[in-house]
Amino acid sequence: MQFLDFLIALLPALFWGSVVLINVFVGGGPYNQIRGTTLGALIVGLGLLITGFAKFNNPTVIIVGLISGALWAFGQANQLKSISLIGVSNTMPVSTGMQLVGTTLFSVIFLGEWSSMTQIIFGLIAMILLVTGVALTSLKAKNERQSDNPEFKKAMGILIVSTVGYVGFVVLGDIFGVGGTDALFFQSVGMAIGGFILSMNHKTSLKSTALNLLPGVIWGIGNLFMFYSQPKVGVATSFSLSQLLVIVSTLGGIFILGERKDRRQMTGIWVGIIIIVIAAIILGNLK
């Protein structure tokens, strides 16, 4: 593995972790954000179409791409709703942990990914680490009873719903063996359709939607870097490195967006995201 390949493999985490930061920075609310983000992803998809990466000779790729893209839009829209309630730094560690748990459980139960005792043992350790890491990143502030906070409770429910969309996006491709640049155009079309449907009954503005195009473009470029890095550094390594997005988004929420945390919460966040990343590395190497 060359050092340059390793640096490129880090870029998906940087790009994907920046998506929600830019969404919140430019504002507009979750419905403008999801419509703009999905249209931005479609711009990248159209670029792939123009350059000949989109193939129309495989109906499975087309159908799975469209459906999985719509599922991603559903997951992202609900994640943005949670962010509007409790902020980026509270949402992203929990969302990342839920996604890892959800995709892992589905893959183990329905796809039989853990076939040896060693995989089962290390997999269970990783799951325990994930739950622990998420709990640490969600520590309440001093004199704060977070469990009695109605917005926090509502956000957790929304994140569970969001996770269903994200897990569906990932596992659908695994089930049918669909992925890579061949599927990205059709996924981006599904995302744009999903984003439009999810926002069509809500007030949106052209300006706010346009400002939120950038996060979608960044998401799509992050995918391209992921596809490039997988054959260079391996699927397990590229997957593990991509989960560093939780560090980018969580710390970006605190230091860039100014979400306030006390010393106890900051300690929990630092330790929690390290534990989540360790768990992601373990899970990545079990694939």
Curated annotation (Swiss-Prot):
Protein name (database record): Probable glucose uptake protein GlcU
CC annotations in GO: plasma membrane
Signal peptide: none
Function: Involved in the uptake of glucose.
Lineage: superkingdom: Bacteria
Location in the cell: Cell membrane
PANTHER family: TRANSMEMBRANE PROTEIN 144 (PTHR16119:SF17)
The species this protein was found in: Staphylococcus aureus (strain MRSA252)
Family affiliation: Belongs to the GRP transporter (TC 2.A.7.5) family.
GO molecular function: carbohydrate transmembrane transporter activity
Keywords, sorted A to Z: Cell membrane, Membrane, Sugar transport, Transmembrane, Transmembrane helix, Transport
Annotated InterPro entries: Sugar_transport
Membrane topology summary: Multi-pass membrane protein
Pfam families, alphabetized: Sugar_transport (PF06800)
SUPFAM superfamilies according to UniProt: Multidrug resistance efflux transporter EmrE
Main location: membrane
Transmembrane segments: 7-29, 34-56, 58-75, 114-136, 156-178, 183-202, 209-228, 233-255, 267-286
